[in-house]
């Protein structure tokens, strides 16, 4: 992970919500503050489990009915773009999302929210995923097209 920081800030940060990159990361670097990034897979949306209106039994969305942050008018299209990148490079979408967050130099800790052992294994092994320049380029193209879709 990134440098060792004595002070931390905790913000949501993921492929769909990169607002911290604009200003926040610069100020944090200047003030020697690291980012504890939470919601790296966007409340599960970047795993693909909620695509096309799916509502898996036992999921947080089903249990608590309060996960609308990533359901704005352009969110599903943006999510699909990142899922397609994972498919293109044969990378599990959760691992792609987690490693994207972990790879950022301003991130000192990636706060995962695994609710079962399979999710935990995917999160922990995401560190082994090599995000090449080509993958980062595809991620940036998707971000340029869709931007921050968290509401």
Language-model-detected regions and their locations in the chain:
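C-terminal amphipathic alpha-helical "assembly" element
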Residues: 102-103, 117-144, 148-151
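Conserved, mostly hydrophobic/aromatic
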Residues: 9, 28, 35-38, 82, ...
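Glycine-rich beta-alpha junction loops
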Residues: 13-17, 39-46, 100, 116
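Conserved short secondary-structure transition element at the edge of the structured enzyme core
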Residues: 71-128
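Alpha-helical segments flanking ligand/cofactor-binding loops in enzyme cores
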Residues: 22-26, 99
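Short, small-residue-biased leader/transition segments that mark boundaries at the very start
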Residues: 1-5
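Structural preference for beta-strand elements that scaffold enzyme active sites
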Residues: 6-10, 34-36, 108-111
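Glycine-rich, positively charged active-site loop/lid region within alpha/beta enzyme cores that binds
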Residues: 26-85
């Amino acid at each position: 992970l990134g440098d060792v920081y004595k002070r931390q800030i905790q913000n949501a940060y993921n492929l769909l919500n990169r607002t911290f990159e604009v200003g926040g990361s610069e100020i944090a670097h200047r003030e020697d503050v690291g980012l504890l990034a939470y919601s790296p897979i966007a409340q599960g949306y970047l795993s693909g489990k909620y695509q096309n209106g799916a509502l898996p039994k036992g999921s947080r969305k089903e249990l608590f009915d309060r996960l609308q942050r990533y359901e704005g008018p352009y969110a599903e299209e943006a999510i699909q773009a990142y899922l397609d990148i994972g498919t293109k490079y044969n990378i599990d979408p959760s691992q792609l999302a987690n490693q994207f967050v972990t790879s950022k130099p301003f991130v000192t800790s990636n706060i995962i929210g695994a609710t079962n052992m399979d999710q935990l294994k995917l999160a922990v092994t995401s560190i082994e995923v090599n995000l090449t320049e080509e993958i980062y380029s595809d991620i940036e193209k998707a971000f340029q097209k869709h931007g921050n879709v968290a509401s």
